[in-house]
Regions:
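Coupling and communication elements adjacent to P-loop NTPase active sites across diverse families
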Residues: 1-56, 69
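ABC ATP-binding cassette signature C-motif
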Residues: 39-236
Length: 236
């Protein structure tokens, strides 16, 4: 069945070949962003300089100073419970107000984005036509989804499979900015290098929170530590 789906993909969509390749390992993740709408490198997406800002009822920051340009990749670290995810969601909401910017969001809790009552194919499908569904099936097969996993409810998937589904969603959407909360946490040690490579090669801007030092070092150009006083640039 997989061979039939792959042959159909070749007929229907050459672009699909740019995005995924057949995995060599069971948990391999070989995805690629392509046909990307680049933002100017010097364009400011974010330029905050705010005193005594209340991010949430439990999070007040004395001085929030942060800028992000069109192709910049910034990581945020900090102690557990210091408010990294809350800050990231605040920045996501702020950036979402921009009408000329496309954003891909990967929260820690995938169910915020995934529609659990849909199948993976239905979730990724825009038109619902046969050729599109065959291309999507091929992408999912390349990510080691079984036929049942492709067609049953997303709620039945493991955390790792949900993570792969959300990665594929980001790749197919190809947004100009990615906001990623602990992007590597649900992936196996053998697939994490491929996830890091995907985001390192991503041609847009990234705002990310993570405890994964290897990921931060490989992907990010700047890293900030968050505490109640604000953000301080650090080396890790």
């Amino acid at each position: 069945k997989m061979k039939a789906v792959l042959s159909q993909e070749k007929r229907y969509d050459r672009l699909a070949q740019d995005m995924t390749q057949m995995p060599e390992k069971e948990d391999s993740i070989e995805l690629f962003f392509s046909h990307f709408d680049h933002l100017p490198q010097g364009k400011y997406l974010l330029n905050l300089d705010e005193k005594q800002i209340n991010i949430a009822p439990h999070l007040t920051i004395d001085h929030l100073k942060l800028s992000l340009k069109g192709q910049e990749k910034i990581g945020i670290v900090g102690d557990n419970g210091c408010g990294k995810s809350t800050l990231l969601h605040y920045l996501y909401q702020k950036l979402s107000q921009k009408t000329n910017l496309t954003i891909g969001y990967m929260p820690q809790h995938y169910d915020t984005i995934l529609q659990n009552d849909l199948s993976p194919i239905a979730f990724l499908s825009k038109t619902g036509d046969k050729s599109e569904r065959e291309v999507i099936s091929s992408h999912l097969a390349n990510l080691n989804f079984s036929h049942d996993e492709m067609n049953h409810a997303i709620s039945d998937l493991s955390g790792g499979q949900k993570g792969k589904l959300l990665l594929l969603h980001l790749v197919l959407e190809s947004p100009q900015l990615l906001i990623l909360d602990e992007a590597t946490r649900n992936f196996s040690p053998t697939s994490q290098p491929q996830v890091r490579q995907l985001f390192e090669n991503y041609p847009g801007a990234i705002l990310t929170v993570s405890h994964d030092v290897n990921y931060l070092r490989q992907v990010c150009q700047k890293i900030y530590r968050l505490d109640s006083r604000g953000l301080e640039e650090v080396e890790i």
